[in-house]
């Protein structure tokens, strides 16, 4: 048993990752699947659930396993049949969900947008698939988390999870601005502590189970006692301290300051050597990766919040490009607005594209002068900018798909599998972690045949998708 544990730990250690271009191509499968589903949905009364699963779960599973070396072919295999089917079916004489223009609410508020649900659902699915697939040889080692420097699919996944949480968290800030009512500090603190308490409990449970069951662990990922649940729990608590500052300083600047400070520490003489080589003889030394990377994850969360300011509302608000606003730009345009106010009051797509190009430029500039490269282990400045640029870019493309199909912000044209996962995101993520542990404890993942590996992964995906769909159909929503 110990020998197998050591083999499994070695299997995910010392890795160097792959190229950003390949990661983009592989994850584009999620976007292609969403596009294909929308094509079919325009012609069918309803897209069969099996087709939905094959597109959004099986397609992503194949992209990180069997078709990992040829993602372009897989994208074509998904898109072309959907287009052919579209031509065979022809245009339906009656469509059930054509957007009705002119019925937009005159009242400023938040609306559920299909592209955000699809983006978050796809991100959660590929994250859940990867945390088990990484233990099988069919999952390329370049997609697994790197040891220290480099980029990989799984490195992107953890950052995207935090970015997505930040985007959703922006809704509470927007509601406060729109209503003009801000809850007292103690109320926000109690709410954050309650949510953090559940995540901390999950983190402790994972820690105890890993140590008690002698489950394989990758110490340089977060440390000997730290895990991702602790990071998820503490980030919103840290935002309670940051929020008062954000009244005067935009979140984007605070995010950059946190990342620059982290970068300053890493480039101080001797600090990087300490982070990589030091003994793990006390709590700080033992968990130094989790503690230092916390600054970077806070920065990513803040950038996600900033994104929510211009994508969640039902119309552009004044200066929503960089701050939460409850003033509708349409209501204020009759007044004399400054050029700055006009340029920074944007639609979702305009805001996403603006920040995408800014972030890509900052990333390229940083990489040109940075002595090292991206590091998820330390969540350094290049990592923060890479995660932000990726998510902004893919959100832009999801938004373009909605525009192409003329989906209104009130429409519910979202694949059930994506909506189901998105509705119970953290619970699904927890379920995936538990199933991953059970499978690893009862199966030799390293020596399985290709057929057994694919069968196990498809079975795992089917169970998670089924649980999510059943909960969704039964209107069971668990907010952890």
From Swiss-Prot:
It holds the Pfam family GWT1. GO terms for molecular function: glucosaminyl-phosphatidylinositol O-acyltransferase activity. The keyword Transferase applies. It is an enzyme of class 2 (transferase). Its main location: endoplasmic reticulum. GO terms for cellular component: endoplasmic reticulum membrane. The chain crosses the membrane at residues 20-40, 47-67, 70-90, 114-134, 153-173, 186-208, 228-248, 252-272, 291-311, 343-363, 381-401, 426-446, 450-470. Pathway: Glycolipid biosynthesis; glycosylphosphatidylinositol-anchor biosynthesis. Its EC number is 2.3.-.-. Belongs to the PIGW family. Probable acetyltransferase, which acetylates the inositol ring of phosphatidylinositol during biosynthesis of GPI-anchor. This is GPI-anchored wall transfer protein 1. It comes from Eremothecium gossypii (strain ATCC 10895 / CBS 109.51 / FGSC 9923 / NRRL Y-1056) (Yeast). The lineage of its organism: Eukaryota, Fungi, Dikarya, Ascomycota, Saccharomycotina.
């Amino acid at each position: 048993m110990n020998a197998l544990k050591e083999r499994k730990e070695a299997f995910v250690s010392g890795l160097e990752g792959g190229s950003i271009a390949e990661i983009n191509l592989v994850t584009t499968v999620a976007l292609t699947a969403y596009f294909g589903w929308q094509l079919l949905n325009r012609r069918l009364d309803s897209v069969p659930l099996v087709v939905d699963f094959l597109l959004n779960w099986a397609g992503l599973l194949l992209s990180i396993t069997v078709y990992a070396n040829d993602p372009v072919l897989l994208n074509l295999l998904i898109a072309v049949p959907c287009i052919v089917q579209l031509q065979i079916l022809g245009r339906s004489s009656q469509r059930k969900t054509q957007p009705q223009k002119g019925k937009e609410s005159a009242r400023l508020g938040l609306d559920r947008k299909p592209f955000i649900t699809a983006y978050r659902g796809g991100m959660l699915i590929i994250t859940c698939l990867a945390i088990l697939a990484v233990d099988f040889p069919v999952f390329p080692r370049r997609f697994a988390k790197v040891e220290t420097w480099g980029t990989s699919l799984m490195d992107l996944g953890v950052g995207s999870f935090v970015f997505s949480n930040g985007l959703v968290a922006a809704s509470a800030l927007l509601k406060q601005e729109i209503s003009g009512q801000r809850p007292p500090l103690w109320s926000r603190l109690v709410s954050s502590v309650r949510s953090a308490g559940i995540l901390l409990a999950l983190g402790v449970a994972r820690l105890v189970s890993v140590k008690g069951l002698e489950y394989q662990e990758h110490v340089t990922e977060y440390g000997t006692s730290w895990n991702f649940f602790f990071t998820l729990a503490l980030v919103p608590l840290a935002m309670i301290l940051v929020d008062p500052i954000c009244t005067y300083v935009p979140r984007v600047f605070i995010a950059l300051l946190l990342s620059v400070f982290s970068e300053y520490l890493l480039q101080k003489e001797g600090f990087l050597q300490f982070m990589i080589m030091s003994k793990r003889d006390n709590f700080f030394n033992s968990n130094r990766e989790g503690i230092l990377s916390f600054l970077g994850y806070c920065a990513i969360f803040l950038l996600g919040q900033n994104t929510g300011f211009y994508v969640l509302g039902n119309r552009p608000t004044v200066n929503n490009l960089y701050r939460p606003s409850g003033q509708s730009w349409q209501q204020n345009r009759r007044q004399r607005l400054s050029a700055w106010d006009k340029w920074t009051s944007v639609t979702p797509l305009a805001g996403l594209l603006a920040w995408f190009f800014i972030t890509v430029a900052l990333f390229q500039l940083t990489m040109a002068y940075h002595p090292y490269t991206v590091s998820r282990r330390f969540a350094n400045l290049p990592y923060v900018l890479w995660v932000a640029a990726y998510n902004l870019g893919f959100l832009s493309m999801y938004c373009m798909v909605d525009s192409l199909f003329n989906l209104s912000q009130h429409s519910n044209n979202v694949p059930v599998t994506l909506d189901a996962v998105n509705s119970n995101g953290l619970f699904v993520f927890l379920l995936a972690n538990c199933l991953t542990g059970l499978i690893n404890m009862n199966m030799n993942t390293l020596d399985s045949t290709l057929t057994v590996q694919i069968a196990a992964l498809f079975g795992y995906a089917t169970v998670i998708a089924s649980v999510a769909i059943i909960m969704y159909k039964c209107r069971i929503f668990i907010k952890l």
